[in-house]
Amino acid sequence: MSLINEHCNERNYISTPNSSEDLSSPQNCGLDEGASASSSSTINSDHQNNQGFVFYPSGETIEDHNSLMDFNASSFFTFDNHRSLISPVTNGGAFPVVDGNMSYSYDGWSHHQVDSISPRVIKTPNSFETTSSFGLTSNSMSKPATNHGNGDWLYSGSTIVNIGSRHESTSPKLAGNKRPFTGENTQLSKKPSSGTNGKIKPKATTSPKDPQSLAAKNRRERISERLKVLQELVPNGTKVDLVTMLEKAIGYVKFLQVQVKVLAADEFWPAQGGKAPDISQVKEAIDAILSSSQRDSNSTRETSIAE
């Protein structure tokens, strides 16, 4: 127990940690610069299991006092004054807390520990509790607005707004719950926009039931079949390409035409009772016709080139 007691005009501090003495007996002048004995206060420790100091006027007891200044070793501070700091709110506003004794408190404990130490603060119908900022608590709902003796100011570790029986959190989340900012700018991936604004025009396709398409398909099939037959008729037609095969086919056809012309000549066919011509004669006639036909074809090519 430590005791500091000086003159009444100077500060007095009385500390009784873990004392079970009656805290209602005024003994000294305290925390007052004047000589008035009515403003004296006594500093005593909380007689519960917590280390701390309690300030209250020397003319009142703990049971009927409305002013409490509680310094606890667990970082719980309560300041009560008989006067309200702000003019009382009588219009039925949402926060009539300035209407009574103002209590300032800092709480480092859990809410259950605060309730065991100061049930008046926790059980109030309207309270504004904070854990990282200042808040106001009041029980003006249970008492008339003219009673200025029960207003509280609470400072604790997280911000909780309590109006009636609802508790709403008004403070941002703790820094430990936030993800660290790495400084990287995350950008949404954008799809490359095409010149047609992403719209692809369908190709104009003809329906398979179109008569023109069906006819063209059938024509191509017939041409391929005839070419295969011609390759088989021309000697060595399957061993060369299509152009060479066609040229040979043309020459072969002309040769056949000459043979037909020679064989159809009357001179080669004697009259009835006559003698049939020799094969050598027929061959000479065919060669003459072929040579003449080649000269005619060459002349036509030269004239076409000259033109």
Curated annotation (Swiss-Prot):
One Pfam family linked to the record: HLH
Compartment list: Nucleus
A single GO molecular function term of this UniProt record: DNA binding
Biased composition (Polar residues): 12-28, 183-197
Cited CDD domains: bHLH_AtIND_like
Alphabetically ordered keywords of this record: DNA-binding, Nucleus, Transcription, Transcription regulation
InterPro entries referenced in this protein's UniProt entry, alphabetically: bHLH_dom, HLH_DNA-bd_sf, IND-like
Segments for region (Disordered): 1-49, 167-215
BP-aspect Gene Ontology terms: regulation of DNA-templated transcription; root hair initiation
Self-association and partners: Homodimer. Forms heterodimers with RHD6. Interacts with TIFY10B/JAZ2, TIFY6A/JAZ4, TIFY5A/JAZ8, TIFY7/JAZ9 and TIFY9/JAZ10.
Protein name (database record): Putative transcription factor bHLH086
Taxonomic placement: Eukaryota, Viridiplantae, Streptophyta, Embryophyta, Tracheophyta
